[in-house]
Amino acid sequence: MGVSCYELEFKDIKKKVLDSINELYFKDYYIIHNDVNERSITHKLAIYLQNQFTDYDVDCEYNRNMKNPKKITFIERNTRNRVFPDIIVHKRGEISNNLIIFEIKKCKDDNVTNKYLENKKHDIEKLKGYVNNNDEVPLKYKYGFFLEIHKDFFFIEIYFNDKSKKDVIEKRLKDDNFKMSGN
């Protein structure tokens, strides 16, 4: 039958996500280092997440909420818009098992523009909407991960459906015997 999102502990979820990101940097460092499109990176990460979360579906750019398009309310803009999350870990057709939602940004360390910062702010606003259970049609994701991918490190902000909680992780490639592959 599988595991529900309420049976997995946060520390186990965080470990699985970090293991997937480590695998991405190890096996696919070439696409990160050579400025390949962000969608290519998210696709590869989704594969590694699927290997970790075998009882779940892992989808990229998935825009359905049951039979309806996925929408969230943007409080700052007072609008309700369709959204296309970068990656989700969920069980299709079961809103009660929406586990993790990812928004991912690839960052060129030498060229952080105002547009990049504006897009990052918008992605974080979307994440808060995904985990906010007070929306008109709540999506009820348990965790929202904002992942910023740099050539030599990554940065994660984790949002919980309990608005008072947030976790931050920064990992440099030299940390924890972190290794890269040139393949």
Model-derived regions, located:
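Charged, often low-complexity linker/regulatory segments
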Residues: 1-50
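Surface-exposed cleft-lining segments at the edges of enzyme active sites
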Residues: 28-34, 74-76, 108-114
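Short secondary-structure junctions
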Residues: 49-58, 138
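Active-site metal-binding core of divalent-cation-utilizing nuclease and nuclease-like domains
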Residues: 57-95
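Conserved catalytic cores of phosphodiester-cleaving nucleases, focusing on short active-site segments
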Residues: 86-89, 98-110, 127
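Mg2+/Mn2+-dependent nuclease catalytic core
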Residues: 109-131
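Nucleic-acid nuclease catalytic cores
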Residues: 131-162
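Non-catalytic C-terminal interaction segments of nucleic acid-processing enzymes
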Residues: 166-183
